[in-house]
Structures are given as structure tokens and as C-alpha cells.
Amino acid sequence: MKQEFQYSETHYGAAPCRPDVHGVLIKGKRGRLLSVLYTAAGEGTHPTVLLLHGIPGCEKNYDLAQDLRRAGFHVLSFHYSGSWGSDGDYSLAHDLEDANTALNFILSDERFGFDKDRIYAVGHSLGGFVCGQLSASRPEIRKAVLITPCDIGRLPVIREQAPDYYRAVCEVLEESAD
């Protein structure tokens, strides 16, 4: 006996009221930062997490983004300049600037319902290091979570290739050790 599959459409509310995933291009100093925005269900503004991935990529962080979205947060994850299709050339020295650019996008955008008073940052590995720097310099970030942050300030290659960045990193590490 042949069974027939029945299909019925599910209609959701307006786009801001249902969970969704958006591709977002954020304009940075070296071109576009390719970004993914997870929006939570429900009307009104939502607390927002800026999710900073490590290098080489972010595929390990998407499960965290999904969980945060289910918990009612909007989550923005971007790719650093020169990585994973974002414009420009990659440099560790530009990571913090890219994170500031993404944060400025959250603070200035009016389309997606970001709660500007409830912005959090979460970073893993290199993203954890950048997250620490960002949260130390930007009071708009209420809380930060650093997941196994790397200590790139102690790497000799950074000292040689980007001495100004190395000095800034060492200052942050010394301050956080106090």
C-alpha cells in the first residue's frame, strides 16, 4: 500500500519575532567582514553576544551560538580581516580592530533589535585573547567569557613582526595578572 506524504506549511510571525540566521557584511577598514548573526525568537530587543572565534576558524563555535540563541540572545560572529572570505590581509595586529568594528556595528544597527545595554563578549582561543582586550577597553561590554584564551603576547614571532602590538599585549597581560 502506497502512503502519501502530507506537507503543511508552518507560518511564523514577522522575521524579528522568530529565530533566524542572517549573513551580514560589516564594513571595516580593510573591506567587508563576513559575519553570521543568529537572532533569537520574540519581539523587542534582545541581549547580544559578540562571539569571537579562534584561528583558523569558527565552525566549532556555531553550536555555542545556537545554544545562546535558544536562551534568548542574539549572537554575532564575524571572520577577521583576510580570513574565511573577509576582505583584506590577515594579521594578528588587526584582530582587535576588527572586533571593535563588529561591536560598533552592534551599537549602531537598528534593524536587528540589539539591546545596547546588554552586550556581552565570548571568545575562544585567539578569540578569547581578543575578547579580553576588547572587554578591557570597551565599557559597553557588560561581561566577557574567555574560553581557553591563548597567550599570544609571549610568542617570539609576535615580538619580531609586530613590536608595538607585542608591547600592548604585554601590558594587558601584566594588568590582568594583578
List each language-model region with its residue ranges.
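N-terminal cap/lid segment of alpha/beta-hydrolase-fold proteins
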Residues: 2-43
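The alpha/beta-hydrolase serine catalytic core
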Residues: 11-16, 23-25, 136, 141-178
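Short beta-strand element of the alpha/beta-hydrolase
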Residues: 45-54
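The serine-hydrolase catalytic nucleophile loop
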Residues: 54-67
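Conserved alpha/beta-hydrolase
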Residues: 65-85
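Alpha/beta-hydrolase active-site loop
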Residues: 90-112
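Alpha/beta-hydrolase fold nucleophile elbow
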Residues: 112-125
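Glycine-rich nucleophile elbow surrounding the catalytic serine of serine-hydrolase chemistry
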Residues: 123-133
